[in-house]
C-alpha cells in the first residue's frame, strides 16, 4: 500500500509491509529505483524519448490527483500546480482527461 504525504516541501512515499510497519522515503528515491529497474530490463537496447516516458508516468497521476483535490476546478488546479490554465487544459486533453 502506498500513500503520498507532504513533508515540508518533499513528497514522500509511505510503504506498509506485512508486519504493518510504515517506512517513508522521498518520492525521488522511488523514481530513481524505478529507473534503475527499467535500465536493468533493457539489456543494452537503445531508448528513445525517455524524458517523455518518465514525464508521462508522473504527470498523468499528478493531474488526476490535483483535479480530484480541486473537484475539477481548473483555475484552482492550475494555480496549485503553478502553471497557466491554458497549459493545464492542454495537458488534460493530452491524457484524455478533459
UniProtKB/Swiss-Prot annotation:
* Pfam families linked: HTH_8
Highest taxon of source: Bacteria
Q: Give the keywords, sorted.
A: Activator, DNA-binding, Transcription, Transcription regulation
The record places the DNA-binding region at: 74-93
Question: Which is one GO molecular function term here?
Answer: DNA-binding transcription factor activity
> Could you tell me which InterPro entries the record lists for this protein?
Fis_DNA-bd (IPR005412), Homeodomain-like_sf (IPR009057), HTH_Fis (IPR002197), Trans_regulatory_Fis (IPR050207)
Function of the molecule: Activates ribosomal RNA transcription. Plays a direct role in upstream activation of rRNA promoters.
The text of the family note is: Belongs to the transcriptional regulatory Fis family.
Q: How does it assemble?
A: Homodimer.
Record protein name field: DNA-binding protein Fis
Species of origin reads: Proteus mirabilis (strain HI4320)
Q: Which gene encodes it?
A: fis
Amino acid at each position: 500500500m502506498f500513500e503520498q504525504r507532504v513533508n515540508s516541501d518533499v513528497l514522500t512515499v509511505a510503504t506498509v509491509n506485512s508486519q504493518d510497519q510504515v517506512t517513508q522515503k522521498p518520492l525521488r528515491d522511488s523514481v530513481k529505483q524505478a529507473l534503475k529497474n527499467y535500465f536493468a530490463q533493457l539489456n543494452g537496447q537503445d531508448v528513445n524519448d525517455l524524458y517523455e516516458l518518465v514525464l508521462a508516468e508522473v504527470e498523468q497521476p499528478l493531474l488526476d490527483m490535483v483535479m480530484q483535490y480541486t473537484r475539477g476546478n481548473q483555475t484552482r488546479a492550475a494555480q496549485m500546480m503553478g502553471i497557466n490554465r491554458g497549459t493545464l487544459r492542454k495537458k488534460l486533453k493530452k491524457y484524455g482527461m478533459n
